[in-house]
Amino acid sequence: MQVTIPKSTSKEDDKNRNLLPKNVKPIHYDLSLYPDLETFTYGGKVVVTLDVLEDSNSITLHGINLRILTAALEWGSQTVWASEVSYGDERIVLQFPSTVPANSVAVLTLPFTARISSGMEGFYRSSYVDSDGNTKYLATTQMEPTSARRAFPCWDEPALKATFTIDITAKENYTILSNMNAVEETVKDGLKTARFAETCRMSTYLLAWIVAELEYVEYFTPGKHCPRLPVRVYTTPGFSEQGKFAAELGAKTLDFFSGVFGEPYPLPKCDMVAIPDFEAGAMENWGLVTYRLAAILVSEDSAATVIERVAEVVQHELAHQWFGNLVTMQFWDGLWLNEGFATWMSWFSCNHFYPEWKVWESYVTDNLQSALSLDALRSSHPIEVPIMHDYEINQIFDAISYSKGSCVIRMVSKYVGEDTFIKGIQKYISKHRYGNTVTEDLWAALSAESGQDISSTMHNWTKKTGYPVLSVSETNDGELLIEQHRFLSTGDVKPEEDTVIYWAPLKLKTMKDGKAVVDEKAVLSDRSKKIKVDKEALESYKLNSEQSGIYRVNYSADHLKKLSQIAVEKPDYLSVEDRAGLIADVASLSRAGYGKVSSTLDLIKTWKDEPNFVVFAEMLARLNGIKSTLRFESSDIIAAMKKLVLEVSATKAHSLGWEFKANDDHIIRQFKSTVYNYAGLFGDDKVVKDALSKFDAYASGNKSAINDNLRSAVFNIAIRYGGAKSWDQLLEIYTKTNDPYVRNSCLRAFGVTEDEKYIQKTLDLTLDPIVKEQDIYLILVTLSTHKNGVLAMWKFATSNWDKLLSRLPVAGTMRGYVVRFVTSGFTHASAIDKIKEFFADKDTKLYERALQQSLDTISANSSFIDKSLDDITRWLKENRYM
């Protein structure tokens, strides 16, 4: 086994971080657990083999809400017992009467007791209702990022890798799972003890175990690139058939990744488990991957968006088995090495298995726009964000670490070439397997393979906050002048905020003899650059072909008109990615004051017959974004914007129809459902009538009345236009179903209501146990999109803040989500002071980033309204929407 000795990202960072003392280092853990799912308590014993690095009479390790019964330390022929055990700052400090000499191997034995948590962190319980209506419980784990310390005493830092041997004793009717395969199971007096094989060298945050009544489906890897091994999807009884898609895809994906990475999957099995209560979307525990129900279960009739989402999540988690598990970031400031790469790899793999889905087209409107949106705020953060305290870690599980991180990977892979990139990744994995790395290790491998200085060119992309807008103008000498400056959504960049120069691949697309050509190697590495082009190119140039660069492009109004017409007259010139990216850039830049919003509206009107789903959906999203930002403005302008969105969406909805045919492909199913939802919500008579009819039939028991692709849209439209009857019917649907997708559709739809009475009833659901804690934010998402919802939600949240927080786990990202949805819906700067006033006496350290990002979003929206309201009004009047 090749092992890389962990290194620090920075000695200064380690000095300032709240890390454990370095006098001892764990080598191996023997962990025994005895959970009781009736009392929700458990006993345990951990025996840790330690490498003693310094003379020591004190040992400090992590632990939260664990009661240590005794503490024995053995080395050589000596055994001593702790003279003092103290707790605090998420640590357990053990004092011993004797000193263990450096260079010893010692064994620490700690029996302990604890409660099985209810908070979706550490070792916790999850509930479900079985087919007989009985509430059942299972016990599972969520260790990432720093909750292993909630489950057992340990050294809970990613660089402190060790091996683990686990045995668990529980009632014999339970299935017991852990990272490795069970090598022995014994039953005595109604109790079953499962002992698992020793793990690979791994970080504590990847450890997992589950005790539950489960059933499973099983597939085997093809055996082409890794040994033939079982891949199982476990579910609570009655759901295993819905795990077939994920199990089969998982088996193929493990083999595929083994080939791509040049490193066979090292474990003898891979289990994937659907957990009823789960704070995140999924968790990549090595060999025992856990998921929300809605991230892994699908049926033959599931909506296209659901199937694609499950495929993406499964492949994301399995990519982690290499990027994150086999090779792990040194510390959490390198989280992007895990999440950015796994995100990119999931799209890479999805494109391999389902090329007809054309996922790289939607990547531009999904990951790229998510990254650009968050990173345009002053309160964004670098991809490699300094982390000094553990409570900061959960706040960087966001679109910067995931989406921007993956966009950096995509940008590099496009520039050096995919084959070269993959070979560099293989070198990186081979060199650092079972070890820890920093970003420079990745760049070194890619530099060695490509022959280019990747480390220098990519430095600012991971170390600095933000990204540039590239402004293009034409000189009198027939040249293109390209300048870069930092982009902020408020459009008010200060000189001191505009000091970073980014390396930006220009990917300049031009017309040559009527055909598209792309300069793949042109880059901007200074503040500005001039490029000589011919006359034909001057009429047709488009930067950032395929949107592979992480920046926006600002064209003159005249050139934007030329590009919009070229797209109509020569539809093959601008790719789907180009067109979607152009819409996104123009809309975002005009919101920030680079040009007029009327330019966005003109472009969308010109492309109203756009045939591609990704481009059309981006157009609708941008129109709806403008309308939504105007939620507190006059009823006249809101009505006019609604009329515009209705015209664009309804025309396409009627053109495509909303009956689903057997030969409808994956993309057309998404297209039909998207435009149906928009047309219905914005009041198309035929769509509303159809949706209400379908909903009544469904609520009366005819579950086949709604195609799965339309279910969310029908629920939304019914709540918007069906009144009290529909709201009550939807609540009954929610309480009676155990289908996670139906339940999620219900929760999102509740917030669509603009009726104040039913908004209040919807808000009351957030405190009602019938809504799982993991799902509270789903209600708030849609409430935050309309005026009545924003106002009522703020009043409710500020009146019930402690109750609301008590339903949200301390660890994880849920508190940040809730804060963001409760606060970010305001659109005038006057709201900022009242939000600050409310939170002034609150401990906001667990959601400080989310709060600041909300305030920045409000500032950006307020600035947008101040700059653009007159322009929008004029355009709507000139085009007869007002």
Swiss-Prot record:
EC numbers: 3.4.11.-
Site (Transition state stabilizer): Y402
GO CC, alphabetical: cytoplasm; cytosol; extracellular space; fungal-type vacuole lumen; membrane; multivesicular body; NVT complex
GO annotation, biological process: cytoplasm to vacuole targeting by the NVT pathway; peptide catabolic process; protein processing; proteolysis
Residue sites binding Zn(2+) per the record: H316, H320, E339
Pfam families xref list: ERAP1_C, Peptidase_M1, Peptidase_M1_N
Signal sequence, start to end: none
Active site residues per record: E317 (proton acceptor)
Cofactor dependence: Zn(2+)
One term of GO molecular function: metalloaminopeptidase activity
SUPFAM superfamilies assigned to the protein according to its UniProt record, in alphabetical order: Leukotriene A4 hydrolase N-terminal domain, Metalloproteases ('zincins'), catalytic domain
Cofactor comment text: Binds 1 zinc ion per subunit.
Alphabetized UniProt keyword annotations: Aminopeptidase, Hydrolase, Metal-binding, Metalloprotease, Protease, Zinc
Protein name from the UniProt record: Aminopeptidase 1
Lineage, broadest ranks: Eukaryota, Fungi, Dikarya, Ascomycota, Taphrinomycotina
